[in-house]
């Protein structure tokens, strides 16, 4: 009887996805690249513990779609942000987005005086994106 129930379960659970499910939209939810330093800021990396915080947001909404936090990374830092890093799984990483990289002694979301930042626009699904940290928050 158990074998029969397992067989019935497998038959009904292995149905094809509906044709209107946009698999490519979900498959391409990534951005891959490097975070680099402008030469003028290389000496300003904090001593001791610090965090690299990379955020992805669309061009209309200030709330990030995805965030990656890394403690004391080596530079140039190679990153890949995928849909697994999304803050809200109802939002989709797609189209043109703004990537921001920030070096901070705090792992918090708020920008603080002394943080080092850089940003660039990128297309979701792109590899080879470069974010250059070139600004100090005053």
PLM regions with names:
Residues 1-7:
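Sec-dependent signal peptide recognition
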Residues 10-13:
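C-terminal motif of bacterial Sec signal peptides marking the signal peptidase cleavage site
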Residues 15-18:
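Bacterial signal peptide processing site
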Residues 20-21, 36, 76-80, 120-138:
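Extracellular beta-sheet/turn segments enriched in Thr/Pro/Gly and aliphatic residues
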Residues 31-39:
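A short, amphipathic beta-strand motif
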Residues 51-57, 98-102:
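Beta-strand signatures of extracellular beta-sandwich domains
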Residues 100-114:
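Short acidic/polar inter-strand loop motif in beta-rich domains
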């Amino acid at each position: 009887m158990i074998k029969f129930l397992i067989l019935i379960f497998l038959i009904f659970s292995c149905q094809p996805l509906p044709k209107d499910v946009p698999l490519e939209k979900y498959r391409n939810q990534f951005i891959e690249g490097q975070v680099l330093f402008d030469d003028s800021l290389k000496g300003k990396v904090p001593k001791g513990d610090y965090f690299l915080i990379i955020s992805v947001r669309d061009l209309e909404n200030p709330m990030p779609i995805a965030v990656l936090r890394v403690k004391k990374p080596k530079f140039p830092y190679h990153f890949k942000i995928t849909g697994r890093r999304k803050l809200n799984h109802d939002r989709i990483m797609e189209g043109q987005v703004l990537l921001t990289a920030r070096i901070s002694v705090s792992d918090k979301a708020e920008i603080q005086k002394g943080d080092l930042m850089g940003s660039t626009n990128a297309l979701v699904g792109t590899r080879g994106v470069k974010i250059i940290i070139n600004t100090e928050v005053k």
